[in-house]
Structure formats: structure tokens, C-alpha cells
Amino acid sequence: MYSPTMAVPLQTKYTLSPITNNIPRSHCPSLLRARVTCSLIPAKKSHPNREKLVLEKRLVNPPPSNDTTLQSTLTHRLWVGAGCTTVFASFAKSIIGGFGSHILLEPALAGYAGYILADLGSGLYHWAIDNYGDESTPLVGTQIEAARGHHKWPWIITIRQFGNNSHALARGITFTVLPLVLACNDPVVHGFVSMFAFCILFCQQCHAWAHERKSKLPPLVVAFQDMGLLLSRRQHVNHHRHHRTYMSYCIVSGVWNNVLDDNKIFEALEKVLYVQFGVKPRSWSDPNSE
């Protein structure tokens, strides 16, 4: 096969202008003989990455509300169940160990620290998958794809079923917390671990509630949002409003968002990564253009 577009370099044996200077125009055609060579260059066949095309196609249109990709499967529910069971086991060890050792304040303070740091942890993870990697990234590729879709159609998260939305985090919690449950009996450690893991496991649900209208939320959730214990819609709106610079990544309580945004912590991290590795975050370009 040859390309329809051919490179045709023109090569002349003699300089044309001196030959024709003193010759009548009517005789020029018989003397203007040029040797023309055609170079036929085979076209290089393009083999697009079919898998990439399929993945990108998913981001073209929002899925309908009854799309199976938004529904929970049995596997999703099993992972959520495993994650919740693991967190409960850690919490039980904290309570039982605290009463057995006659220490209650320390596990409670450790739990509070876990709650506060879980918000920070959710922000760091949210920032990472929003800005780096793609669908082919090991372990978190599907979450990165979902995050990109979320920035195109934020309202989709309100119709995504709980197990579908949280199973990936529940799986991670199961693998990380279960060894601690089996190996450690310290009530203070489990006070921190159980609260941190609980907040991380449910942070995507907190995120979904922050996109929902108050009229559709349970009264207790609205009360917690108004008290600042859970991320509210008013707090989270900045994350989707600033198209050139993402903000408000933390999605448990949002308590860290002002600190991180005012001090431009994530912007500093992005610059460091760019200088060191030459990788630009997606926040440096319009996310809706992807």
C-alpha cells in the first residue's frame, strides 16, 4: 500500500533562467525539459490503542440513571461488609481494651485525632487521583477514571449506589486494618485506627451527600453538615467552581480545606513534582477539556 500523499521532489538538470533569457516564448516548451523523480514513500500504518479509545468513549456522555455501572454488585457489597466488619473489630478492641485497662480518655483522644487526620488523608488521596495517572494506572485506574467523569458530571455521584461508590475504599481498609486487628491489642492504637478507617471508608458517601440537596438528605446528616462535622455542599462547591485551580479536596469534614487552600499546599506540591519529574497536574489545564 502506498500513501495517497506522495513526496514529489523536483530535480532540474540545468538552471532554467539562463536557457530561456533570449529564446522566444513560443519555443520555450520544447526546451524546458526537467527531469522529475517521484519518491513513493509507503504510508506507516497507524494502530491506535483500541483499549484507550474504549476508555475515552466512556467519558463522552453521562451514564443514564439506571446504568449498571452505577449499581452495586454482590462483590461490591461483600467488600463493604468486610471493610465494616474489620473497622468494627478494631473499634471493639479499643473499647474493650480501654475498659480493661481503665483508660478511656486516651482512646477517645486518639479517635478524635483519627477523625481529624482522615479528612487530611482524604484530601491528599483526592488530589492525587484528580491530577495524576490515568485509567491504566495499577490499583487505582478505575478510581481515576471515575474521578475524571465526576468532574464532567458531578451530579452522577448522587445516584451512584453506596456499595458501588465505596467498595474500593472498603477493600483497601480490609487489607490494611485486618493485620492490625490480628496483631495489636493496644486500645489507643485501635482508637485511632478504627476512627481513621471508618472515616476513610465512608468519605465517598460524605462526598455524595455534599452534592445532594438538603431536602433529600436525612435530618441527622443535615445537622452534622451544619455543625461542621461532615462536609457540606457550601464547603465543597469551590472544588468544582475553580476550573483552573482545584480547591477543597478534603471530603470528610472539610476542616483542612481552608488551611490547605490558603497556604497553597497542593499548588506547592504540584510545582515540586513538575520540577522533579516533569509531570503536569490536570489542575493546570481546564479539566473539562479532557
Which residues are covered by each model-predicted region?
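Cytosolic/stromal cytosol-facing helical appendages immediately following the last transmembrane segment
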Residues: 2-74, 132, 136-139, 152-163, ...
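The first (N-terminal) embedded transmembrane alpha-helix
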Residues: 74-94
